[in-house]
Amino acid sequence: MYRFSDYDVIVVGAGHAGIEAALASARMGEAVLLITQTLDSAGRLSCNPSIGGISKGNIVREIDALGGEMGKLADASMIQYRLLNKSRGPAVQAPRVQADKFLYSQLAKHAIELEKNLHVFQDTVIDIVSSNTNESGYVEKGSVQYVKTERGREFSAKAVVLATGTFMEGKIYIGEYESPDGRLGERAAIGLGPALAKKGFTVGRLKTGTPMRILRRSFDSSLTEEQEADEIMRPFSFSNAEIHRPYAKCYITHTNQETHDIIRENLHRAALFSGKITGTGARYCPSIEDKIKKFPERDRHHVYIEPEGLNTEELYINGLSSSLPEDVQDRMIRTIPCFKDVIITRPAYAVDYAYVSPIQLSSDLQTRRIEGLFLAGQINGTSGYEEAGGQGIIAGINAALFSRSLKFKDEKYVPFVLKRDEAYIGVMIDDLVTQGVDEPYRMFTARAEYRLNLRHDTADERLTERAYQIGLQTKEASNRLKEKLLTREKIISLWKDIKITRDLIAKNPELKNHIGKSLADALHDPQVSLECICAIDENSKDYSAELLESAELEIRYEHYIAVQNRKIAKVKRMENTKIPADFDYDAVSGLSTESRTRLKEVRPETIGQASRIRGIRPSDIMLLSILL
C-alpha cells in the first residue's frame, strides 16, 4: 500500500450527497479529497430528470440557503418549471423542474473542478480503517484513520464522509438477468459493505428502480395530453433573480387493460417477484408490476413522458419502472397507443444495494461506533436526489467542524444540527436517526409538524445567517437576506398605512366588505387577491413577484404562524433537555423493558428526540424528564 498525504476530509462518492458534502467542507476551508469511480458521472440524475417536488423543492432551497450547489445546478439546467399545489395553501406548495440531465452533471463536475480546496481521485474505496479494531475487524469506539482503495492506495484524513448511493454492493436486475452494477453499465463498489458489517455496523439491503428510456421519434405525441407547466421559470437559488432557459414539453398518457394483462401473465419473470431481489423497495415509488399486483381493480395508471435534455432524443417514461425481462417490457409498452412503434434505448431495471441502519448515527450524521465517520444519502436508507443533497451538506459541514476541532485544540467540536422547526432537512435527519428505516425514506410535507414555518420561500430566512456564521455562506448572501427582510417590512408597513375608501372599492369590488380597513387587514380575507392589492399600491411595480408574495403570506398567515410558534415554544423544553451520551438506562428503576431496549439502541440526544422513538411509552418519557 502507498500512503498519500493527509487530508482534512475525505468524501467517498460524487453523487448528490457527495457533491454537497465535498463542496461544503472545502468552502469552509478544509483540505478535501473526493474519491469517486469516475468524475464524469458526478451529479448524475440516475432516474427521473427532475429536481424538486412536494417538500423536496423545500429541501433544495434549504441546501441553497446553506450555501450548497443543488439549487444553482437546477437553475442552470432547467427546461421546465412548475409550482406544485398552487391551489392549496403555501405550506404544501413547492417548486419542481425538469432538468437537462447531461447539462446538470456537466455543471456539477465543473463546480467540483473549480473548488480550490478540493482534490479528486478516481478509484473505488473498499475499507475505512479506524483505531480500536480487533483481530476480527470489529470496532469498539474507534476513530477514523485512513481509507483503502481498490488499486492499493491509502489516504489519511481527520474525517470521512461516505456517500455511496446505490453503488455499495449494488446489483441490477432485468428479469432473469442480474449484474453487479450501481447503475446499468456502471460497476458496483464491492467490498465496503462487508467491511462495515465486520466493524459492527448493522448493514441491510434496499431496492429502487428506474423505467425504460425511448427514442423521441418513435413516440406519437399527438396521442397524448400535454402536461401543463408554468409560463415563467422561477429560480431555486436565492442568488438568482430570474431564469431564462429554453422550454421543453412533457406529456401524459395511461396504461390500459391489455398492458396489465401482459404484466400479470409475466409476474413470475419479474425479479421483484421471483425471489432474486432481497432489498425492500419504497411503497411510494412502486414498479408497474407492483402497481398491477397491489391495485388489481384499477384499469389504468398514469404514465408521464419527460425529456432527458435539450440535446438528446431520449425520453424518460415516468410510471413504468420495472424489473420485468426486456421482451415483456417491449410488449407491454407497445400496448399504449402513443408507443405503438416505440424504440427502447435503455431497458427499465431494478437495483438493490447495501445501506447502513441510520439509528447508528447521531444528529450530525456521525456514526457512534467510529468517531469522524459521517454517512450521507442512500447509504442511510433514503430515496431521492434532494434527500441525499440535504444530508450531504450537513455531513460536509460537520466533517469540516470536526476536522477543525482536531487541528485547533482551542476550537471545540459543536455539531451543526437543524431542528424539526428549522428545516425539512432537520425533520428528515431526526426521523432517520430516531426511528430508522424499513424501506427507502422519502420526504413528505406530512412528516413536518411545523410545515407552515418551513415554506420554500423562507429557507434563506431560516438558514442563511446560520451558514454565514460557520463560514459556508457568503457576505453577499447575508446582505441579500437583510435587504429582502427590510424591503418586505417596508411593503407590509405601506399596506398597513393605505386605507380602503369608497373610491377604491368602485375600481376593486372584491374590497367591498373592507371599507376603512387597511390593505394589510383586507389580505386576511381569502377572497382578496394579491393582484387586487398591487392594483391599488402603485409602488408594487418596483418589487419582484417573489417579494410581494412573501409580504402577502406574512400578513395572510400571521395568526396561524403565531399559533405554530407558540406550539414550538411549548416543546422547546423537551428539545433542549439533553441526555448524556453515556447515560445508563439500566440504572433507571421503573423503565419498561421495551423502552430501555429502544433507548439503548437509538441513544437519543434529547428528551424530545426520545419521545419520537417508536415503542417508547409516555410514562417512560415522563420518568426520564424527572431524572434529567
UniProtKB/Swiss-Prot annotation:
Any one Pfam family here would be GIDA_C_1st
Q: Which SMART domains match?
A: GIDA_assoc_3
Biological process, per Gene Ontology: tRNA methylation; tRNA wobble uridine modification
Binding residue positions for NAD(+): 281-295
Where does the protein end up? Cytoplasm
Enumerate the UniProt keywords alphabetically. Cytoplasm, FAD, Flavoprotein, NAD, tRNA processing
* Intrachain disulfide bonds: none
PROSITE patterns found in the cross-reference section = GIDA_1, GIDA_2
Residues forming coiled coils: none
GO CC, any one term: cytosol
Cofactor(s) the record lists = FAD
Residues annotated as binding FAD are 13-18
This entry's Gene Ontology molecular function terms read: flavin adenine dinucleotide binding
Q: How does it assemble?
A: Homodimer. Heterotetramer of two MnmE and two MnmG subunits.
What NCBIfam families does this protein map onto? Answer: mnmG_gidA (TIGR00136)
The similarity comment for this entry is: Belongs to the MnmG family.
Entry function = NAD-binding protein involved in the addition of a carboxymethylaminomethyl (cmnm) group at the wobble position (U34) of certain tRNAs, forming tRNA-cmnm(5)s(2)U34.
Q: What protein name does the entry list?
A: tRNA uridine 5-carboxymethylaminomethyl modification enzyme MnmG
